[in-house]
């Protein structure tokens, strides 16, 4: 999966974060997902002093009522926190959890 994402710099469940990560966790909990989403953040150098962060989140398919495709979503940001916020937002917009 790490193809050209860069160097892994962090894996987190973003439990202390504010903004979209706790909203995504709440949305998934209400949709009968049993675990908080886990975010992986990769860093890729773009030039002198320039780093592109790519956060990914994997949301497994749900086994309650109907089958849903698993989602592997990624987003870019200029900081680790921004990339996590962006990927959580994209996951909320893309998932049909509730």
Question: Which sequence ranges carry the predicted segments?
Answer:
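N-terminal segment of the canonical double-stranded RNA-binding domain
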Residues: 1-70, 77-85, 89-98
